[in-house]
Amino acid sequence: ATDSVYLSATNSALVGGDFYTLVRLPDDCAVMILGDVSGKGIEAASMSALVKTALTAYAWEGAGPARMARSLNSMLMGFSRVETFVTAFIAKIDLKAGRATYCSAGHPPTMVIRPESMPLGGDEARGGEVELLGCQSGVIGAFESMVYETGVFTFAPGDMLFMYTDGTIEARDRTGAFFGEQRLRDLLLSVSGEGVSGICGKVLGELDRFTESALDDDIALVSLEFLRGRS
């Protein structure tokens, strides 16, 4: 189950550099991608479409997240006349194993929401928590020699993956204070018991309240809930 929302800072048209896609693969596997291409408007939207297409192709070729980032980096570095930087979170998810590998290339830390669970049999109850995925690599398209690392996380049914672009935590209120990572974590934990449906809308609503409807960057939010045997 997934939930997503996109808001462009370009008021004249709903275009921008943020993009996301879920690629469903055979054998209960999937690749989740959220990215942010430098710039705004039509040019950023055009480049984000190209980047999204390339990453989707790499996913179908069976590449892992770090290899996908390396391949995209090589492609962008080959565009000698175009200086484009991309931040991206790429996760390859094995739903049967309850395990995923990921590469976070210059991207804000993705969060795994683990809602409070009731005990089953002799098990102990699990308190709710929000885990930051801390394995970080550099941006894509900056240096040919950039190294991209692979991180791993596990998940249980009911856990949720929350991905967002930097405009989320960099949103400011009228005093100049950032919305920030901790405020986002606290908000996600407070709504985690409600499930994935509408969670992105709740975050966007809080951002709108915090900034007094004055968001000045493209924002993409994607939440994915892990269910038994499917996403």
Regions found by a protein language model. Give the residues of each.
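Short Ser/Thr-interspersed hydrophobic loop/turn segments at strand-loop and sheet-helix junctions
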Residues: T168
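Cytochrome P450 core scaffold surrounding the K-helix E-X-X-R motif
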Residues: V112-P115, R172-F178
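… and, occasionally, acidic/histidine-rich disordered N-termini of signaling adaptors
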Residues: A1-F162, R209-S231
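Divalent-cation-assisted or electrostatically stabilized phosphate/pyrophosphate-binding catalytic cores
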Residues: A156-P157, A177-S192
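Short, glycine/charged-enriched secondary-structure capping and boundary segments
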Residues: M47-A49, G176-F179
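ABC-family ATPase nucleotide-binding domain "signature/switch" substructure
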Residues: A171, D208
